[in-house]
A protein has these predicted regions:
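ABC-type ATPase nucleotide-binding domains, specifically the catalytic core motifs of the NBD
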Residues: 12, 68, 93-112, 123-125, ...
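The feature captures the beta-strand-to-loop junction immediately N-terminal to the Walker
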Residues: 33-35
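Helix-to-loop junction immediately C-terminal to a conserved catalytic motif
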Residues: 48
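Conserved ABC transporter NBD signature motif
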Residues: 56-64, 76, 112-117, 218
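ABC ATPase C-loop
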Residues: 151-152
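Helical segment within the ABC ATPase nucleotide-binding domain
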Residues: 174-187
Length: 239
């Protein structure tokens, strides 16, 4: 479904990713681990069309995405939940969610928005309690739920999730990760998860990639093949 092949990418003249190749199949979950500064966020931003690509290719559902802007990639069914959540604080929870449905046609909105909203609040009941509240007054965990819910309103087939546990209380991390598990089981949604918490990656994902200094140092082994020693060794390779 998603194929990243020999990607070199970064920001302007600053190259961050070097010859990165990875694959995500329909309904699969893959994780990307690595130390701070390894290029994990840049990888997701590159797939979403938000970085400069110097070489290589990104294919989604058999279509090349080279040169395609981010909004066009989103319209194909590729959703990005960025690090830091990026919700609109002055808008209500409901308004934030409705913005997430922008790629639907007018007929689809009329027919499906109510059902989509129901599915999001079923997944995150706390959002139903805060439906009319401004997003800026939500807790960090509630804002993360809102960011994921907003992405789901576009009916994606692939969702890229960047550091969902960042800055959250343990009970909120458990709720957010539980929701990602539900999405896999109930929606057959393909997920690419960037996360510092190794156990969350191993619990959710079928395969794991490890980045260090912008290069893959461990490429897509199944989670049961990864040992803690192997993960630690990969983190400290020079790349």
């Amino acid at each position: 479904m998603l194929a990243i092949e020999n990607i070199h990418a970064g920001y302007g003249r600053v190259r961050v990713l070097h010859d990165v190749t990875l694959y995500l199949a329909s309904g699969e979950a893959i994780g990307v681990l690595g130390p701070n500064g390894a290029g994990k966020t840049t990888l997701l931003r590159t797939i979403a069309g938000l970085c400069t690509v110097y070489g290589g290719s990104v294919m989604f559902d058999g279509k090349p995405l080279d040169g395609m802007p981010g909004h066009a990639r989103a319209s194909l069914g590729l959703a990005h939940v960025p690090e830091g959540r990026r919700i609109w604080p002055s808008l209500t929870v409901e308004e934030n969610l409705l913005i997430g449905a922008w790629r639907l046609t007018p007929a689809e909105r009329k027919r499906e928005v109510s059902t989509l909203l129901d599915s999001v609040v079923d997944l995150f009941p706390r959002l139903k309690e805060r439906f009319r509240s401004r997003a800026g007054v939500l807790s960090g965990g509630e804002q993360q739920m809102l960011a994921i819910g907003r992405a789901l309103m576009s009916k994606p087939s692939v969702i890229l999730v960047d550091e969902p546990s960042l800055g959250l209380a343990p009970i909120m991390v458990e709720a957010v990760m539980g929701a990602l598990h539900q999405l896999r089981q109930q929606k057959n949604l393909a997920i690419m998860l960037v996360e510092q918490r190794t156990q969350d990656i191993l619990d959710l994902c079928d395969r794991v990639y490890i980045l260090n200094r912008g290069r893959l140092v461990d490429g897509g082994r199944r989670r049961e093949e990864l040992t803690r020693d192997a993960i630690e060794a990969a983190y400290f390779r020079s790349g």
